[in-house]
Amino acid sequence: MDRHTEGMRGTQLRMAHQALGLIVTDICGMLGQIFKADPAIGNDKKLNSKIVLFDENMMSTLMGGFPNLTWLSVEVPAVYTSSMMSQDGVSYYVDVTHQYGVPSDVCPMPAAELGVALADDFPLIGCCAVQCNTTCDGSLMGNGIEARSFKIPTFQLAVPIRHRQESVQEYAAEEVVNAIHFIEEQTGEKFDWDAFFKSM
């Protein structure tokens, strides 16, 4: 944490510690769940059957309507946490992606994620996955290959990039409803609107 708070004093330092503390707590909880579910470590089959993988940009708010399920993101600990701790922590995975033939001008964020999938380093957990095309076309490029590496049914949610335009609202809502139906079909759980609104 010190690297991210260098030079801070007083209120600014306290706020940074509070914010980073929340991130650390969240990541530790997520890693604990991943380790429990991973067949190579904890092999908790019951937990695994209740996990829905979301990519790092997928709106986790959606899972408020599935109180009996757990959402996890395998990209967050593998790519984002490691690069927060060490800026060159994911360079190897970016190189793997380039060696695969992806141009080097693709954003390093989705390139690193794709590299983890290509190197077969993601834990194989969950009963299904939902991915979205944000934040950029680089994410869209890697999602299909990542989905194959997860070896579970995966839904690709296509978010309109110009999401504030009136002309895309109906389509965007339809995509979210399709994702909900996909999760229902894969898990046997029904979306609970009361739980959803309570969680917001």
Feature annotation, model-predicted:
Residues 1-200:
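An N-terminal assembly and electron-transfer interface module characteristic of large anaerobic redox
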